[in-house]
A protein has these predicted regions:
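Alpha-helical substrate-recognition element adjacent to the catalytic core
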Residues: 1-82, 179
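Mg2+-dependent phosphoryl-transfer enzymes with acidic/Ser/Thr/Gly-rich catalytic loops
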Residues: 27-34, 69-74, 81-179
Length: 179
């Protein structure tokens, strides 16, 4: 890596999910997230990277998933580049020390500015054209984990991230099934 990474910014629909939007009869939205992507996000956080979920859609499931993993979130953001400019500036992080994983046209402005633009395998051609990495996995199917591992490898931090991950308490509870 030319500059140490400080922030990992993730689009949601098409990156953390497969892009499908599920609405029940009451208009409530559900999303499906991949467990391996969650581990990748935790690995990024364990090496001190800020992780932000950035999406144009307003979505309670996105907020819940971000909170569960310890990531930050910004939902209902129409102009991602303007929001991210303020967010990075507020953190004192230059654009070249940020990575962004995207999949569609609304991600292009941000991808052209960050130091580490990444496209998912099933992203549109315009996004792939500006990416330093095109994942082999599609959005919602482990693409974020692949991107995080690639970034960790380039920073020489993968082994340390895995060590820290394995050293954590697992947080599981044990009980007996009801008889």
């Amino acid at each position: 890596m030319t500059a140490p990474l400080e922030a990992l910014v993730l689009d949601v629909d098409g990156v953390l999910t497969d892009g499908g939007i599920i609405l029940d009869s009451g208009g409530r939205e559900s999303k499906r997230f991949h467990a391996r992507d969650g581990v990748g996000i935790r690995l990024a956080l364990l090496v001190g990277w800020r992780v932000l979920f950035l999406t144009a859609r307003g979505s309670i499931p996105v907020k819940n998933r971000a909170q569960e993993l310890g990531a930050e979130w910004a939902i209902g953001i129409g102009r991602k580049e303007l929001f991210l400019e303020e967010w990075l500036e507020g953190m004192g992080i230059p654009w070249e020390r940020a990575a962004f994983v995207g999949d569609d046209l609304q991600d292009l402005a941000v991808m052209r500015r960050v130091g580490w633009p990444i496209a998912v395998a099933d992203g549109v051609d315009e996004v792939k054209a500006v990416a330093k990495l095109i994942t082999t996995r599609p959005g919602g199917r482990g693409a974020v984990r692949e991107a995080v591992e690639w970034l960790l490898d380039r920073a020489g931090l993968r082994e340390e991230a895995v060590r820290r991950f394995l050293a954590q308490e697992d947080g599981f509870s044990v009980g007996k099934p009801e008889q």
